[in-house]
Swiss-Prot record:
EC number(s) per entry: 7.1.1.9
The species this protein was found in: Dictyostelium discoideum (Social amoeba)
Cellular location(s): Mitochondrion inner membrane
Catalytic function, reaction form: 4 Fe(II)-[cytochrome c] + O2 + 8 H(+)(in) = 4 Fe(III)-[cytochrome c] + 2 H2O + 4 H(+)(out)
Gene Ontology biological-process entries: mitochondrial electron transport, cytochrome c to oxygen
Keywords: Membrane, Mitochondrion, Mitochondrion inner membrane, Translocase, Transmembrane, Transmembrane helix
Gene Ontology CC terms, in alphabetical order: mitochondrial inner membrane; mitochondrion
Functional note: Component of the cytochrome c oxidase, the last enzyme in the mitochondrial electron transport chain which drives oxidative phosphorylation. The respiratory chain contains 3 multisubunit complexes succinate dehydrogenase (complex II, CII), ubiquinol-cytochrome c oxidoreductase (cytochrome b-c1 complex, complex III, CIII) and cytochrome c oxidase (complex IV, CIV), that cooperate to transfer electrons derived from NADH and succinate to molecular oxygen, creating an electrochemical gradient over the inner membrane that drives transmembrane transport and the ATP synthase.
Membrane topology: Multi-pass membrane protein
Subunit record text: Component of the cytochrome c oxidase (complex IV, CIV), a multisubunit enzyme composed of a catalytic core of 3 subunits and several supernumerary subunits. The complex exists as a monomer or a dimer and forms supercomplexes (SCs) in the inner mitochondrial membrane with ubiquinol-cytochrome c oxidoreductase (cytochrome b-c1 complex, complex III, CIII).
Protein name, as recorded: Cytochrome c oxidase subunit 3
Primary site of residence: mitochondrion
Similarity section: Belongs to the cytochrome c oxidase subunit 3 family.
A family per Pfam: COX3
Length: 435
């Protein structure tokens, strides 16, 4: 509740009073909405995320400060158990199941911890985000080196096949996949998923809408018109309108108690008990610039209307983005299912010479990356569902270090890397390798 007043009224009440007196309620509200859409730190954000992105919590340090967590141990210890189990030092199905559960749980805890570091502790500053993006880039480069070595092996044996495999490629007598069918379907699925995910990220990070014919502006103007019509029909049938319900939600019993506390603070300051700097946001309920008689009801209604408009827009925007995330996940799941079907009914196995080994190594390693990318997209989807992205301004495509969607951007980079690797796989293995 306090966050609402502290961030919304502190900067806007005076301008609302003055503007409302001069040009009317509608123009005043529209002016506030237009102004708020232009700032990277919007005042209304605390309506959706308590104690998140408040100016007093913003950090300006270059250090990567993290919370204490058991996640690293929960992830690394099971890996050691997997190695011991692979070499037969430890043989226990129950222990293997416990280790797998610990590994997955550690990854979940680690992800939640990173999100808390960013959102609630505000530790992901510009420099930290820059380091995170650079870390993801370096990770992708290291993965490129992995695939480079695998492709090198493939070209080394395929461009100059020896007599052991009949001096031909693919090896003589081996039935291979055609580049049509499932491989082509998988290519379409991955490219489509990349385009859909990019579109979702573009919608999230679009710049301020300034053109009158912009779809966003038209939608908000229509919503404003509908809300004002509801406001004019107040108490028509002894019922509260949408705006009144919103106002009562924010200005109920708790608000009256805060007003009382604010009045006590003002009296204490007048008596010299407290200094002026201790008052903070409460002063706006009792002071007004230029001795203008304050109209508390009008700014209250205007701020509620502003909140309602933003709620309507965010609901529509996030619904569109979540739909794109769902489609991306669907494409990824279908891709993995097609890969599994291809492996199960493959006319050759990993033991069928060098071709089978390289085929399953390249496609399997890529499939693992698709699985990891799907998990990352799933995390972004869950964050949208729980409301981590209920923010009007999250930055732009060209402000990766400054915006509030760095995780989404890194996931997008990784997914495009997966797409590009698959294109090379499709051309080299399925098309050129089957001719």
């Amino acid at each position: 509740m306090k966050g609402f007043f502290e961030n919304l009224f502190r900067q806007n009440v005076r301008s609302v009073i003055n503007t409302g007196k001069k040009v009317g309620a509608r123009a005043a509200a529209r002016e506030i909405i237009n102004q708020e859409w232009g700032y990277p730190l919007a005042n209304h954000e605390v309506l959706f995320l308590t104690n998140v992105y408040q100016p007093k919590h913003m950090k300006r340090h270059p250090f990567h400060i993290v919370r204490g967590t058991v996640a690293p141990l929960a992830v690394t210890l099971p890996l050691g158990f997997f190695v011991l189990n692979y070499f037969g030092v430890i043989s226990s199905k129950l222990g293997l199941l416990i280790a797998l559960s610990s590994f997955i749980g550690g990854l979940v805890i680690w992800t939640i911890s990173i999100i808390f570091d960013s959102l609630y502790d505000q530790q992901h500053t510009y420099e930290v985000k820059r380091g995170l993006v650079m870390g993801m880039m370096m990770f992708i480069i290291s993965e490129v080196m992995f695939f480079f070595s695998f492709f090198w092996s493939y070209f080394y044996i395929s461009l100059s096949p020896n007599i052991a495999i009949g001096c031909v490629w693919p090896p003589y007598g081996l039935t291979v996949y055609s580049y049509m069918g499932l491989p082509l379907l998988n290519t379409v699925l991955l490219l489509l998923s990349g385009a859909i995910l990019t579109d979702g990220y573009t919608i999230l990070t679009e710049q301020k809408a300034v053109h009158e014919k912009n779809e966003k502006v038209l939608a908000v103007e229509e919503a404003f018109k509908n809300l004002m019509n509801l406001y004019k029909t107040k108490n028509s049938i002894n019922t509260l309108t949408f705006v009144d319900e919103r106002r009562d939600k924010f200005f109920g019993k708790e608000s009256r108690q805060e007003d009382k506390i604010a009045e006590q603070k003002l009296i204490a300051i007048s008596a010299g008990v407290k200094e002026l700097r201790d008052l903070d946001w409460d002063l706006y309920f009792f002071e007004n610039p230029e001795n203008i008689e304050p109209n508390y009801k009008e700014p209250t209604n205007l701020s509620v209307i502003e909140y309602a408009l933003i709620t309507i827009y965010l609901k529509k925007r996030n619904k569109v983005i979540k739909t794109r995330l769902y489609f991306t996940l669907l494409c990824a799941v279908v891709f993995l299912a097609c890969q599994g079907y291809e492996y199960f009914f493959a006319p050759f196995s990993m033991n069928d010479g060098i071709y089978g080994s390289l085929f399953f190594l390249l496609t399997g390693f890529h499939g693992f990356h698709v699985l990891v990318g799907s998990i990352l997209i799933g995390i972004i989807t869950i964050r949208f569902i729980v409301g981590n992205f209920n923010l009007l301004n999250v930055g732009t495509n060209f402000q990766i270090y400054k915006n509030k969607s760095t995780g989404f951007a890194c996931t997008l980079f990784y997914w495009h890397f997966v797409d590009i690797v698959w294109i090379f796989l499709y051309i080299v293995i399925y098309w050129w390798g089957s001719r």
